[in-house]
Swiss-Prot record:
This is ATP-dependent Clp protease ATP-binding subunit ClpX. Zn(2+) binds at C14, C17, C36, C39. SMART domains: AAA, ClpB_D2-small, zf-C4_ClpX. PROSITE patterns: CLPX_ZB. GO terms for cellular component: HslUV protease complex. Gene3D superfamilies: 1.10.8.60, ClpX chaperone, C4-type zinc finger domain, P-loop containing nucleotide triphosphate hydrolases. ATP-dependent specificity component of the Clp protease. It directs the protease to specific substrates. Can perform chaperone functions in the absence of ClpP.
Amino acid sequence: MTDKKAGGEKLLYCSFCGKSQHEVRKLIAGPSVFICDECIELCNDIIRDEIAETVDAEGTRTTLPTPQEICEILNQYVIGQTQAKRNLSVAVYNHYKRLRHLSGRKEEVELSKSNILLIGPTGSGKTLLAQTLARLLNVPFVMADATTLTEAGYVGEDVENIIQKLLQKCDYDVDKAQHGIVYIDEIDKISRKSDNPSITRDVSGEGVQQALLKLIEGTVASIPPQGGRKHPNQDFIQIDTTNILFICGGAFDGLEKVIRNRTEKIGIGFGAEIKSREGKNVSESFRQVEPEDLIKFGLIPEFVGRLPVVATLQELDEEALIQILVEPKNALVKQYQKLFSMEGVDLEIRPAALHAVARKAIRRKTGARGLRSILESALLDIMYDLPTLEGVEKVVVDEGTIEEGAQPLLMYAEQPKVSGSN
């Protein structure tokens, strides 16, 4: 668009907003059209917003995976624990199916939430299962340690801090946070000290259970904005926890004794049947767990009632630990091989060495969690020296490297022969 000035010079205008060339910083000419810098900036903003919306739409699952699909994906990352994975797959599927069913309608039958309790030894995969589920469903996920929680007003973390972390994880998007997953680890550590109500204050045991009750069941939590501290005359962010899935996990050391006391009746007298209490391992005992055992262990009845889905995980044997080392997508052996390949070196860990790593983890009673530290200590020296070693083509780790601390075998590239003058 153009006009003629008094001196005959043409005055140019933006074809979109109508501003003259003197009102804008830059006017760009096209075939019979002009566009100013302000309109270009506005177009960029519109396109950027549309791209972001498209990415969000593609990133969010439009179809909910079936329990079988959930279980198959869990199999790629977690070895063994078949029954626990089936329990989790069904519980998570039903939870998110319930949320889709609830959206925007009022139904005659109200579907209640089924939170989950994972019981299993250290290093059996409780945390990994919860993390993998959240990644699969593309929902916000946060972990909390129950041992750091105290009742409101005491030194320690308030239970509402868990929801604050979840809100921070999804950039203060309230709607996303209200459909997230919270994993509370070490839940067995907040059991009350005895199964009888105490007259003394137990701010990190029964007190925390009482504080968690409403949060897990569903309440509106008031969260200070941007992670600040609560103070009067402050606007709070309201988060409804009704649709947040809570998964609690713990090792529950000593629970097997409670279960055996209930299941194995020891008779007295000459005609009594004598049963050995050593026949069952911890995993077999956990499979028989009942709500009354958890109450006897130290969880209050109301808290047990809010965790209706109980999944037990088994102790990992030597073969399962070896599978964990080599099979999953993010297997430890694959990770170390990748690190060595960045130095241009192949890493071979022989089968005998894998068995030695698994046996060591079993002796330490650390389960899968201890595998990395064993491999790290065995490979530390060679990883320290490798960047300065020349000609190394392959590093071989055998049983002696794991059990006795021997140095790995180094294989060098064959040097090319240079013909010398006679």
